Swiss-Prot record:
Protein's GO biological process: base-excision repair
PANTHER family found in the cross-reference section: APURINIC-APYRIMIDINIC ENDONUCLEASE, ENDONUCLEASE IV ENDODEOXYRIBONUCLEASE IV
The encoding gene: nfo
GO molecular function list: deoxyribonuclease IV (phage-T4-induced) activity; DNA binding; DNA-(apurinic or apyrimidinic site) endonuclease activity; phosphoric diester hydrolase activity; zinc ion binding
Record-listed E.C. numbers: 3.1.21.2
Cofactor binding note of this UniProt entry: Binds 3 Zn(2+) ions.
UniProt keyword terms in alphabetical order: DNA damage, DNA repair, Endonuclease, Hydrolase, Metal-binding, Nuclease, Zinc
Name used for this protein in its record: Probable endonuclease 4
Protein's job: Endonuclease IV plays a role in DNA repair. It cleaves phosphodiester bonds at apurinic or apyrimidinic (AP) sites, generating a 3'-hydroxyl group and a 5'-terminal sugar phosphate.
Family membership noted in the UniProt record: Belongs to the AP endonuclease 2 family.
Lineage: Bacteria, Pseudomonadati, Chlamydiota, Chlamydiia, Chlamydiales
Binding locations of Zn(2+) 3: H190, D237, H239
Cofactor: Zn(2+)
Length: 293
């Protein structure tokens, strides 16, 4: 099983809109100065998804070629719970995982990002084992080694969600790495909300060392860049524009300049829409360029 290699240059983007067609998210990315984007390939709040039409596939691939955007990420639907204790929801989730991965392969997308799941009334151990089983069922889709990596996103520690600590993510990665191409997407707001202090370079040093211990830095494949409206350890998933929350710009400067993180693709999910994303991308690129000068 071949695994998609990391990019050779820093890539920055945002979660852009597919209104009017999937291709439009790519063009919106170009218009805000992005080199990558995150999208929804289907309605994120419904179980059913439409079959991809050939015209949609061709237009999407043409947009990629025209804009030179790469390492596109799809964010899977919010209803999917790979560790659901309810057998009906679990089966729907497994079908949703399979369909999402299949569509991403068809479109030539590089990353597909999932929320790991919620234990609800079951134990976290049972939930994590179900999560492993759910993703394992999609292993045959990777027999031909498509350039796609499944990412599990860090969570903010609210409720019974899995993935708010690196030990849980490490368990999932270690149990899936020989079955599917697997990695982690670190959401800066989420890990801060979960108690990981990333407000300073030393804070990031400690966090990266802990991630390496439990998961392995080679499995850190993407970042969601968000500041936090709430303080450290609040377990609240509320995004703020970069530098306008409790995390601060120094944290994002570190990610753009440290050799371990600067080339890992980064996707903004901050409030403010395209105008703000264009400004934030410009500021992040300045951090990177100042490092090289």
């Amino acid at each position: 099983m071949k695994v998609l290699p990391p990019p050779s240059i820093p890539l920055l983007g945002a979660h852009t809109s597919t209104a009017g067609g999937l291709k439009n998210a790519i063009y919106e990315g170009r218009d805000i100065g992005a080199s990558t984007v995150q999208i929804f390939t289907a309605n994120q709040r419904q179980w059913q998804r439409r079959a991809l039409k050939e015209e949609v596939i061709e237009d999407f691939k043409a947009a990629l070629k025209e804009t030179d955007l790469s390492y596109i990420m799809s964010h899977a639907g919010y209803l999917i719970n790979p560790g659901a204790p309810d057998p009906v929801i679990l089966e729907k989730s497994r079908i949703g995982i399979y369909q999402e991965i299949l569509d991403c392969i068809t479109l030539g997308i590089s990353f597909v990002n999932f929320h790991p799941g919620a234990a609800l009334k079951s134990s976290k151990e049972d939930c994590m084992n179900k999560i492993v089983s759910s993703f394992s069922q999609s292993a045959p889709l990777f027999d031909s080694s498509p350039p796609l990596v499944v990412l599990l996103e860090t969570t903010a520690g609210q409720g019974t969600l899995i993935g708010s600590n690196f030990e849980e993510l490490g368990y999932l990665v270690q149990n899936l790495k020989n079955q599917i191409p697997i990695g982690v997407c670190v959401d800066t707001c989420h890990i801060f909300a979960a108690g990981y202090d990333i407000t300073s370079p030393q804070g990031w040093e400690d966090v990266l060392n802990e991630f390496d211990e439990y998961v392995g830095l080679s499995y850190l494949r993407a970042f969601h860049l968000n500041d936090s409206m709430f303080p450290l350890g609040a377990n609240k998933d509320r995004h703020a524009p970069l530098g306008e929350g409790y995390i601060g710009k120094e944290s994002f400067k570190f990610l753009m300049t440290d050799e371990r993180t600067r080339k890992i693709p980064k996707y903004l999910e901050t409030p403010g829409g395209p105008e703000n994303w264009q400004k934030e991308i410009g500021e992040l690129l300045k951090f990177s360029k100042n490092r090289d000068s």
